[in-house]
Amino acid sequence: DYSKGLKTLFESFNILFLKITTLIVKFIPLAVLCSMTSLVMLTGTETLLAIMSFFGTFVLALAVMLLAYCVLVFMIARLNPIILLKKHASAMMASFSLASSNAAMPFNIKSCHRLGISSRISSFSIPLGATVNMDGSCIYMAVAGLFLAKVFGVDMGGSELFSMVFSIIVLSIGAPGIPGAGLVCLSVLLTQIGVPAEALSLVMGIDSLLGMFRTAVNSAGDVAVSLIV
């Protein structure tokens, strides 16, 4: 009885924190609009051009990651990557629209079944991947961290880069699979590398869109690893 009560308590706290996080995320666009307007008025169109460059670099890095998944599937699983992308396309679209690794798990499991992966493997690998396989989040924090460090004139030496990589790995594994989690992890990373907190305003406006892209790539990674296993 005591263990059941404790379990219920922790589950209630988990639901409460998720609702609070979701509520905060809903009000972020308004704060971002005010912050971005002020920033553009102060710095001019150069800021918008820099953000567009950051977005392009991020999407290109995700495309390279997706290509790496396809190569691994072809070399190890001996499956045509086109078949993988074709059968997983609907799950990737669902992941893109949901922007949540946890919410996309049922779609990924169905995709595994279409690819002939046993339920015994997919029921273990997909939930595990939704927790620890955050390649998209790693890329996001790396690109955003370097971009913002450059914008604010923060020098990044070898030791700083090593510390940054280690922090990104830890933060990506510990990040919950919910919308907006990447932004919270990025704020922690920026604090560590010495970038001012106001730097977040540069990426807040497009974070939701970036979250969709990185979740779709995470989804492809989860299924690709399940296929290889």
Regions found by a protein language model. Name each.
Residues 142-229:
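Transmembrane alpha-helical segments and their short flanking loops
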Residues 1-83:
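Signature of multi-pass transmembrane helix bundles
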Residues 8-23, 50, 86-94, 110-114, ...:
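Short amphipathic alpha-helical coupling elements at transmembrane boundaries
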Residues 2-4, 12, 43, 78-82, ...:
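Juxtamembrane helix-boundary/capping and inter-helix hinge elements in multi-pass membrane proteins
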Residues 94-172, 226:
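Helix-loop-helix junctions within the multi-pass membrane cores of secondary transporters/permeases
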Residues 45-53, 77-89, 154-163, 195-202:
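Membrane-water interface of transmembrane alpha-helices in multipass transporters/channels
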Residues 14, 52-69, 88-94, 161-175, ...:
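Small-residue-enriched core segments of transmembrane alpha-helices in multipass membrane transport
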Residues 84-87, 91-104, 131, 198-214, ...:
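Hydrophobic, small-residue-rich transmembrane alpha-helices and their short perimembrane loops
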